[in-house]
């Protein structure tokens, strides 16, 4: 309690001048109405005019009122006519239930009787007849009025106390006790709503009996002359009903029917009936005072009261209760998984919603009362002092409520804080918020188990390792901020699972995942021959987090994030043939962002992969990557993601399989790790917590460099890549884009992919497949093989030396058209796609036209082969072209195909060719749909998932 009051005192201190200024203004208004209260004002008098005649059928029963007053110690005074006239000049004693005179507070018996006879007032508080039959009811009403006045009139010296710098802690304590008592009474009043007399008596008793309120006069001078009952008994009833309804809505144990009724009551009594009640009472007051109550006057009063009531304030409260309800429903699942944080959030929303509902209902009624009384006072000299009095009082009460509201919010937040600390104590010091991430992960695992169990089949791997990054959770962030435990919260947590033969395995003994040190070790493959490592969600960069909570303002705090970063992920593979898709591993860190969220300064996390044995596949991500393929046939793919064109120059490499890959990633959006701020509010307190998460951020262009060792094949990007091979045997796949591929020396396998590519085999026996697009193919020296398929487009082949072959792998030889065009041989398939072999006839024509010409080069392809192994030699082509005057007749091609000797020769040669092409069958293309290197299409972008095996002849 001491800490709580100290916090309240601290919060009040900074508002000292504001409160003092407001209370001074209030005091000036109250002074005009309360001059007669400087001495003897605490005396209460039941005033009965000597000549007053009352109706025993409808009224209170004067005898009961007098008897009750005498028993309660209220002075009963009968005055002569002259005394009545004198009283009328002092704040309209006769015109109001309560009036102020130099002798004290006067309770007017006639006006009390008249008020209780009003139909509309009676509807709000119960029938006048039921309330006033007999001594007990009269005593209840009078004692309630007496106790309320006794409490509020105790506070007459607040200005003086402030000027003397009285104890702030005492002031805060009194304000808190007052507010808590009001709310407690409202909550209890729902059970005693049968009679207004009981309500007002309870309220008065509660206020009077609260510890410290007997001396409230030392602190609350601004309440001098407070005339609660003169504001209208029915208004208090409406206020209690409306606030009670809000509390019922917040009660999780209330029945559905009761909540429905309470919701109706909140909407209609607070926003509707208060307007009617205030307006009705003010009109009654004017009638009693002999003032006009015509339609225009009534409309003015009603409209003024309506403007003072804001349904939007109650809509915000309803949102809190709705949020609490949704949180409770959401929490059920995670509670079963060992985490109750969402229920704690719901508890907070219910608690603060109840406080908001109570305070808002009180303030709404006060605003309506002040507005209505001011409207009624227009043009009335008699009522003007009352309007001033009411305005001052409502302002003081609203100020006290707002100050106390923050303290009550903090009380609810403290309970949440204590429950979290107690849980951690009872669970061996485990982090409560980390436990929340564990529960979120388990729920996600349950939801996706069917999909995960099918991954072995879908990815064609005996073992699947699934790594899941649980990222920042807003509910966990809210709870950390509300409980002031933001220093303990994490940005997220990474988890690993293993699946074999459709079964979920415990991965802790199979895989080492250490996010703090940057280690991913999947080398313990057991009996599994193939495995696929799948990063289901973007994996944050490695390192450890530390947080520090700092106060930046009166109610403002920020929990700063400090990261001890590790500069790389180290991945270790074993003997299995493994596939790693690293495109979901975050490597780019946005250190600085501009106001639009664009990354202006970055840091990079490297990936170092040691693959070991097996035929491995690695899909490279957005940052620097070092790969040691080890043993086996290893491929490095750049075909997923949009991470810039490749430039590879291996002409100076001294080891086979070693490459330096340079990339320039143009400006655009890419996956980055960035730091953001989560904000949680506890009333006026604002808690900001920094956290890191992954996001596609716009960035400027950047360069990155990869180092590859012991890699057998490289698959390019969708951009215009440049490949320059080594003196060893290289395997390049251009992928999409207009690629330039130079095999250099060695027996190379070169595949263009989509796009109009330029491919040069260089020296050596090369395998060249242009792929789709109009490609320029050059074999260079050596015995080269070219491949063309239907749909590949129009290719141009230049060949010089060696025993070369051209395979139409899906066309029958007899379905092709051979013709001479200028110096070139043009072969057309059934799709009218052409393969032009440049300068096929040039040397022969030179020999015909130039005397003694000696051929210096051979631009012909020695064998052209159909899909079934049938073939035609360059010599046969020359003979048949000449025989057909520049074109081979269809019948001649048929003869070639049907010739037994040629077929026999074709079968023998076909076996050799098949072996050669088969050796290239590991080629992959991001666009060839014939042989799919499986990827979980439900987890990946479909446009990136069709990574293909080689296209065999």
UniProtKB/Swiss-Prot annotation:
PROSITE patterns in the record? HEMOLYSIN_CALCIUM
What keywords would UniProt list here?
A: Calcium, Cytolysis, Hemolysis, Host cell membrane, Host membrane, Lipoprotein, Membrane, Repeat, Secreted, Toxin, Transmembrane, Transmembrane helix, Virulence
Q: Where in the cell is it found?
A: Secreted; Host cell membrane
Extract the Pfam families matched here.
Answer: HemolysinCabind (PF00353), RTX (PF02382), RTX_C (PF08339)
Q: Which GO terms describe its cellular component?
A: extracellular region; host cell plasma membrane; membrane
Domain of life of the organism encoding this protein: Bacteria
Fill in the PTM field for this protein: Acylated by LktC. The toxin only becomes active when modified.
Location, primary (coarse class): secreted
- Please, one GO biological process term? killing of cells of another organism
| Stated role | Pasteurella leukotoxins are exotoxins that attack host leukocytes and especially polymorphonuclear cells, by causing cell rupture. The leukotoxin binds to the host LFA-1 integrin and induces a signaling cascade leading to many biological effects, including tyrosine phosphorylation of the CD18 tail, elevation of the intracellular Ca(2+) and lysis of the host cell. This leukotoxin is a major contributor to the pathogenesis of lung injury in ovine pneumonic pasteurellosis. It also has weak hemolytic activity.
| Name the record gives this protein | Leukotoxin
